[in-house]
From Swiss-Prot:
Residues that hold Mg(2+) according to the record: D450, D452, D454
Entry's family note: Belongs to the RNA polymerase beta' chain family.
Task performed by this protein: DNA-dependent RNA polymerase catalyzes the transcription of DNA into RNA using the four ribonucleoside triphosphates as substrates.
InterPro entries named in the record: DNA-dir_RpoC_beta_prime (IPR045867), DNA-dir_RpoC_beta_prime_bact (IPR012754), RNA_pol_asu (IPR000722), RNA_pol_N (IPR006592), RNA_pol_Rpb1_1 (IPR007080), RNA_pol_Rpb1_3 (IPR007066), RNA_pol_Rpb1_3_sf (IPR042102), RNA_pol_Rpb1_4 (IPR007083)
The protein's name in its UniProt record: DNA-directed RNA polymerase subunit beta'
Molecular function in Gene Ontology: DNA binding; DNA-directed RNA polymerase activity; magnesium ion binding; zinc ion binding
Reaction equations catalysed: RNA(n) + a ribonucleoside 5'-triphosphate = RNA(n+1) + diphosphate
Length: 1220
């Protein structure tokens, strides 16, 4: 029966009772046969039996008496097969009735052993019983033995002989089943609760664990004896297919072999029991049956795995679920889809921001059904068949139709690896020749694509809703800002940058300098007549500009000094945007007065006195885009980008810039600088030989000398570059390369790192223009190799980090507008010593204020409570000298399974307030994970400085923080607030002890002797502050201080890593991740509630569990916050589907089944797995309950049932603007 997934609220998993398994089944599989080798038809009662599993051919019974759909539902009287669709072979199950009960390996072998906990027996003893090595007492009767006591065969016989009837012992799964059935769960639970009040140490831990499992059985209606199976389900045959290969051989799923072994052994056991065979033989057969079932469920979990041909272990049912190739990750979370294709990409400079070039053959294939429909509608083909034939023959009509079919039908382009959401964007297809897809040059940065052979995948959204979402939400022209920091991600690069740089360069003394034009058109005529050059500095009458250009009245009466190139550059900007004359932020308000002269003033004198204005570099072009986006939003910005791209390509071509050997200048001072360095090194070596300095000091000084020499050469080199040198222009404009590349070309390569990461003190004095000696070349190879292998490792590590981050935060969605939280977070600039890591401006921009902020001088209110801090407000706050602002934060959000709009603030990708339904958790994970590949892999070594520990940085440091591991070189933290009274050094055992006297108690800490202190004697220290240098362990910090302090510390530490590498990631993304690590608490004392001590639970669940106790005036439970690493936090989620698809699949499912867990389907992953629309964005329930409302005779706009309907964006006609 088909289930409509969109109708159900939650999904439960539980243990299956034997009757349940029989009720699923359509018949018992009695024989190990699969198919007949001659007829290739399924054997009767075998693993592929058509009577049990349904017909192999659609609507046809096995013997062929009934064929066609009109007999649907009839069971054939000859062969007993029901006439129905062959699809039922994917859903109908069978079963095997076992001759002896068998334990389920998941519940016996998992850690902790669930059976062992219920029975209070060790897994070792269980194994002996199950595999027939020992007997266990079931009923002692009068015998002098305990229940559940183990005994050998000899002891058993002895007791049986003596005590006969009352005494009962057994072995194998039967004995276990009887013991489990005899457990009185309620009594056992009461006893354990009593025991918990006295027990301590290991005993207590064991009792808590047992109570946990027993309570789980009590609450879930599962019976412990169901962990032992009498019946085994047989999964549908089409899920374990058998296919014929060429040459008559068969390939079969491993499961068929495993089922065959079970059936063979089961049938043999039945026969032996019928024959009344000797006990030892029956026992052996039962053990073999147990092992066969173990192998079927989880091959290799116990003992050696059962191997198939070629000694390859067979894949059991558990393996079908596990890992990247398992059911969860391969088929449920990521499926292959139709209407998709992939091809090599090539640059398409002729495209608009919202277009991509689609090769004709791909277009025909992807839009085939659409073309067929259109051909038949237009009567160009009589029916679908002839339309198909026309397409195959590439008829002329097809091309005419194709143009119209793809018009306004957006497609999605994706490039792997998809590190952030901009890895999939929508475009309107434009037909191109050839076989390569054409990509707009400006979106390459978001995709991290280049055109050296990269391939991309294309997908066609089919339904109207999908097309609407692609157009309104995913069109590439709308993705101007990066979600990680709100800065433009589509900025011109390479050719486009150098073209605009060349265009806006000024040069003194160019032809036509000092001419004054009455309008831009006049300047254009002069340029076309070669009277002036782009670089010529000229004057222009300000009054000739349109009235909407922001000039003051005074400026309009004067003449503005600019360059011809800048006049042309400004034409691409919106008409009311300020004239950009210099690369400065102030120019965004209007042009500075210093660029104007009165009519009649001598322009040549002015030009002689003023210096050249810098050309526009890459960073400034980015600033222009950001400013235009802020003022005019998406449409205007994407049009500007296209104009800037075309202008850049045009002018870089015109400039004729090339790079040649002659542009790499030789530095005349180089030999003298090297000579000087050599003599300094000689002096240092002499000092070492005389024993005046140690070897490590000598090494340090030598490396310092060479580093300094390289720096001098670098400075001299920059001085010697002409501004017109193409290599200098390329670097200065930000088009390609940086200064160190050019120092290696023309200066010296400098010191290289050896294989161990230590710097080799012999420098490479040559540069690439002179060429390296063999020795220098060899020294250089170490670094190059390390670089290559580091990059490969980094990519894998970074990808895995992103996966864990996504998993822990995937259910964080903006769920409401406000949650009335009364707590905020006070933020200041993040400092590292004296340097600013992240300024206050960055931290408060786009957030909501928790408290009103007043100007300390004038007492004027700058921003009110719950008001957004935008750029202007943030500037005011910083300029007023305010150092700390309390903002609404994700840390203090009280929204369950997500955050509220006010806690999160601005959506960085749009620059607007975030909308309800935004999947901020996934965006946060991608924003932290995506730059992961740019972080370094190495730990920095402080070059032999005494007491300087190696500091972990880059990717390893981020992992250390988010996995809540004990950091390397951990600092001790003070557990009290007080004064440091004594610091006592103890050279004998190389330690020093620090005594801190607090108000109530005194603490002493022992530290290594070499450690660097952060405080001296007599200094005040606060609780939770580090005594010595080094990273703090966040778990210790949480124990000593509160959640918020710990969260803020972790945020600061992660920001330090990213900002030091020049990567900007917004605080709010990191806040989302850290909050997920701290959303659990551990129950310390259950009070008078039903909670169990030691239980790990969500804060919201804990509050709910405490409510009844508080209302009735009973003692509530107490708990303390727990910091979980992201892997652990992802596995501890309330959704078993999400956890099982992440890691440790069998463990998660075992636990969920025993507890009878219910998955509330609140996150994204669990909904993707069951194929339900995800509850984020347009899939949110609120946005899906839209009804038409009738007003009079006309149907008005659809209206949502919920309060938050106002947050639904109006579908403004984004697309139309691009067609203009």
């Amino acid at each position: 029966m088909a289930i409509d997934v969109n109708k159900f609220e939650s999904m439960q998993i539980a243990l299956a009772s034997p009757d349940k398994i029989r009720s699923w089944s359509y018949g018992e599989v009695k024989k190990p046969e699969t198919i007949n080798y001659r007829t290739l038809k399924p054997e009767k009662d075998g693993l592929f039996d058509e009577r049990i599993f349904g017909p192999t051919k659609d609507y046809e019974c096995a013997c062929g008496k009934y064929k066609r759909i009109r007999y649907k539902g009839i069971v054939c009287d000859r062969c007993g097969v029901e006439v129905t669709s062959s699809k039922v072979r994917r859903e109908r199950m069978g079963h095997i009735e076992l001759a002896a009960p068998v334990t389920h390996i998941w519940y016996f072998k998992g850690i902790p052993s669930r059976m062992g906990l219920v029975l209070d027996m060790s897994p070792r003893s269980l194994e002996e019983i199950i595999y027939f090595a020992s007997y266990v007492v079931i009923e002692p009767g009068d015998a002098p033995v305990e229940k559940k006591q183990m005994m050998t065969e000899r002891e058993y016989r002895q007791l049986k002989k003596e005590y006969g009837a009352g005494f009962k012992a057994g072995m194998g799964a039967e004995a276990i089943k009887e013991l489990l059935a005899n457990v009185d769960l309620a009594t056992e639970a009461d006893e354990l609760k009593r025991e918990l009040q006295e027990a301590t140490g290991q005993k207590r831990v064991r009792a808590v664990r047992r109570l946990d499992i027993i309570e789980a059985f009590l609450q879930s209606d599962n019976k412990p004896e169901w962990m032992v199976m009498e019946v085994i389900p047989v999964i549908p045959p089409d899920l374990r297919p058998m296919v014929q290969l060429e040459g008559g051989r068969f390939a079969t799923s491993d499961l068929n072999d495993l089922y065959r072994r079970v059936i063979n052994r089961n049938n043999r056991l039945k026969r032996l029991l019928d024959l009344n065979a000797p006990g030892i033989i029956v026992q052996n057969e039962k053990r073999m049956l147990q092992e066969a079932v173990d192998a079927l469920i989880d091959n290799g979990r116990r003992g050696r795995p059962v191997a198939g041909p070629g000694n390859r272990p067979l894949k059991s049912l558990s393996h079908m679920l596990k890992g990247k190739q398992g059911r969860f990750r391969q088929n449920l979370l990521g499926k292959r889809v139709d209407y998709s294709g992939r091809s090599v990409i090539d640059v398409g400079p002729f495209l608009k921001m919202n277009q991509m070039g689609l090769p004709v053959p791909m277009a025909i294939e992807l839009f085939r059904p659409f073309i067929m429909k259109e051909l038949t509608t237009r009567k160009l083909a009589g029916n679908v068949k002839s339309a198909k034939r026309k397409i195959d023959k590439a008829d002329g009509d097809v091309m005419d139709v194709l143009e119209d079919v793809i018009k306004e039908h957006p497609v999605l382009l994706n490039r792997a690896p998809t590190l952030h959401r901009l890895g999939i964007q929508a475009f309107e297809p434009v037909l191109v020749s050839g076989k390569a897809m054409r990509l707009h040059p400006l979106v390459t940065e978001a995709y991290n694509a280049d055109f050296d052979g990269d391939q991309m995948a294309i997908h066609v959204p089919l339904s109207d809703e999908a097309q609407a979402e692609a157009r309104l939400l995913m069109l590439a022209a709308g993705h101007i800002l990066a979600p990680k920091d709100g800065k433009p991600i589509v900025a011109p690069s390479q050719d486009m940058v150098i073209g605009n740089y060349y265009l806006t360069t000024e040069e003194a003394g160019r032809e036509g300098e000092g001419m004054i034009f009455s309008s831009v058109d006049e300047a254009r005529i002069a340029f076309a007549s070669k009277v002036v050059h782009y670089h010529t500095r000229v004057g222009i009458q300000t009054s000739s500009f349109p009235s909407e250009k922001p000039f003051t009245d005074e400026q309009r009466s004067k003449i503005m000094i600019t360059s011809v190139g800048k006049l042309f550059f400004n034409e691409i900007l919106p008409s009311d945007f300020p004239y950009i004359n210099e690369p400065s932020e102030d120019n965004f308000k209007r042009v500075d007065d210093s660029f104007f002269i009165d009519a009649g003033e001598n322009i040549h004198d002015y030009l002689a006195d003023t210096s050249i204005v810098n050309p526009f570099k890459k960073g400034f072009l980015s600033d222009i885009i950001a400013e235009v986006y802020k003022r005019y939003k998406v449409t205007e910005t994407s049009l500007l980008l296209d104009r800037m791209k075309d202008l850049g390509y045009d002018k870089s071509t015109e400039s004729g810039l090339t790079v040649s050997m002659t542009d790499v200048l030789e530095l005349e001072e180089k030999p003298a600088i090297l000579e000087d360095a050599h003599s300094q090194v000689a002096t240092v070596t002499k000092q070492f030989r005389r024993g005046l300095i140690t070897d490590s000091e000598r090494y340090q000084r030598v490396t310092e000398i060479w580093t300094k020499a390289k720096d001098i050469i670098q400075d001299k080199l920059i001085e010697s570059f002409e501004p017109t040198n193409p290599i200098f222009m390329m670097q200065d404009s930000g088009a390609r390369g940086n200064i160190s590349n050019f120092v290696q070309l023309a200066g010296m390569r400098g010191l290289m790192a050896g294989p161990g990461g230590k710097i080799i003190e012999l420098p490479v004095t040559a540069n690439f223009r002179e060429g390296l000696t063999v020795m220098e070349m060899f020294i250089s190879t170490h670094g190059a190799r390390k670089g290559m292998s580091d990059t490969a490792l980094k990519t894998a590590n970074s990808g895995y980090l992103t996966r864990r981050l996504v998993d822990v935060a995937q259910d964080v969605i903006v769920r409401e507008f406000d949650n009335d939280s009364d707590r905020g977070v006070a933020v200041q600039a993040i400092m590292d010593g004296t340097s600013v890591v992240e300024p206050l401006y960055d931290r408060i921009l786009g957030r909501y204020a928790m408290k009103s902020v007043f100007d300390p001088e004038t007492d004027e209110k700058i921003v009110s409570r719950n008001e957004m801090i935008d750029e202007d407000v943030a500037k005011k706050i910083v300029n007023a000298g305010i150092k700390e602002v309390t903002i609404r934060s994700v840390f203090t959000s009280t929204t369950e399974h997500g955050v509220s709009v006010l806690d999160y603030g601005r959506n960085l990708a749009s620059g607007e307030e975030v909308e309800v339904g935004e999947a901020v958790g996934t965006v946060a994970a991608q924003s932290i994970g995506e730059p992961g590949t740019q972080l370094t892999m190495r730990n920095f070594h402080t070059g032999g400085v005494a007491g300087g520990n190696d500091i972990t940085q880059g990717l390893p440091r981020v992992q250390e923080i988010v996995e809540a591991r004990i950091p390397k070189g951990r600092a001790e933290i003070s557990e009290v607030t007080g004064t440091i009274t004594v610091i006592e050094e103890n050279p004998a055992d190389r330690t020093k002890s620090v005594t801190i006297e607090g108000e109530t108690d005194t603490r002493t800490y022992t530290l290594p002797l070499t450690t660097r202190m952060r405080f001296g004697e007599g200094d005040e220290i606060k609780r939770g502050e580090a005594i010595n240098e080094g990273p703090i362990d966040p778990k210790e910090l949480l124990a000593v201080t509160d959640t918020l302090t710990t969260e803020s510390y972790m945020l600061t530490e992660i920001q330090k890593v990213y900002r030091l590498q020049g990567i900007e990631v917004s605080d709010k993304h990191i806040e989302v991740m850290i909050r997920q690590m701290l959303r659990k608490i551990r129950v310390m004392d259950p009070g008078q509630t039903d909670l169990l001590p030691g239980t790990l639970m969500d804060i919201a669940d804990f509050k709910r569990a405490n409510e009844p106790a508080l209302f009735e005036g009973l003692v509530p439970a107490t708990a303390r916050p727990v910091l979980l690493g992201i892997t652990k936090a992802a596995l501890e989620t309330n959704s078993f589907l999400s956890a099982a698809s992440f890691q440790e699949t069998t463990r998660v499912l075992t636990d969920a089944a025993i507890r009878g867990k219910n998955d509330p389907l609140v996150g994204l992953k669990e909904n993707v797995i069951i194929g339900k629309i995800i509850p984020a964005g347009t899939g949110m329930a609120e946005y899906r309950k839209i009804k038409s409302k009738v007003v009079g005779d006309v149907i008005a706009q659809p209206e949502s049932e919920s309060e938050e309907a106002s947050d639904i964006p109006k579908l403004d006609d984004v697309a139309k603007t691009f067609d203009n």
